[in-house]
């Protein structure tokens, strides 16, 4: 009997796989447990259409992720840190970066997506690596300017 697997079945087949199995095994175990459905011409065509639609969705999502990467790599985020006698006060956290991306550029990224992030406390240009979907990584440029802390002396 030709069947379409609805779920992964160990040592038998994977989800959406079309396979020939014995009639008894299909009727007595696979069908009652809703692990498979009988493969008819109509169900095979429906499966192919479904897989094609899933593939198109995946391609669209990947293209959108690449566009986000391009956008992220083109921007420069600007921050200011107070300094006094070449000492930097404070730092820039991943949450600060996420907030600026969200508020100013309308890009939402989870702060857990930053790779090997340490708070930024250096004046000048810094780079932060972000892991997006589909294994795509982007570098965000961060420009940190210094603001002299007023000295009462």
Swiss-Prot record:
Keyword Nucleotide-binding recorded: no
UniProt-listed InterPro entries: Ribosomal_bL9, Ribosomal_bL9/RNase_H1_N, Ribosomal_bL9_bac/chp, Ribosomal_bL9_C, Ribosomal_bL9_C_sf, Ribosomal_bL9_N, Ribosomal_bL9_N_sf
Record-level GO cellular component terms: ribonucleoprotein complex; ribosome
Gene3D superfamilies per UniProt: Ribosomal protein L9, C-terminal domain, Ribosomal protein L9, N-terminal domain
Keywords linked to the UniProt accession: Ribonucleoprotein, Ribosomal protein, RNA-binding, rRNA-binding
Keyword Manganese: no
GO molecular function, one term: rRNA binding
Role summary: Binds to the 23S rRNA.
Recorded family membership: Belongs to the bacterial ribosomal protein bL9 family.
Listed name of the protein: Large ribosomal subunit protein bL9
Provenance organism: Mycoplasma mycoides subsp. mycoides SC (strain CCUG 32753 / NCTC 10114 / PG1)
Source lineage: Bacteria, Bacillati, Mycoplasmatota, Mollicutes, Mycoplasmataceae
GN (gene name): rplI
């Amino acid at each position: 009997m030709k069947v379409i697997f609805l779920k992964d079945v160990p040592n038998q087949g994977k989800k959406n796989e079309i396979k020939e199995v014995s009639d008894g095994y299909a009727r007595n175990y696979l069908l009652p447990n809703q692990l498979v459905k009988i493969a008819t011409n109509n169900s095979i065509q429906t499966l192919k259409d479904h897989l094609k639609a899933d593939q198109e969705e995946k391609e669209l999502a990947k293209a959108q992720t690449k566009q986000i990467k391009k956008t992220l790599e083109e921007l420069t985020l600007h921050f200011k840190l107070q300094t006094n006698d070449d000492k930097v006060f404070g730092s820039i956290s991943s949450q600060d970066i996420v907030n600026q991306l969200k508020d100013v550029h309308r890009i939402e990224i989870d702060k857990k997506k930053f790779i090997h992030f340490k708070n930024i406390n250096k004046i000048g240009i810094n780079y932060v690596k972000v892991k997006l979907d589909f294994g795509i990584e982007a570098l965000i440029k961060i420009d940190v300017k210094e603001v002299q802390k007023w000295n009462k002396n």
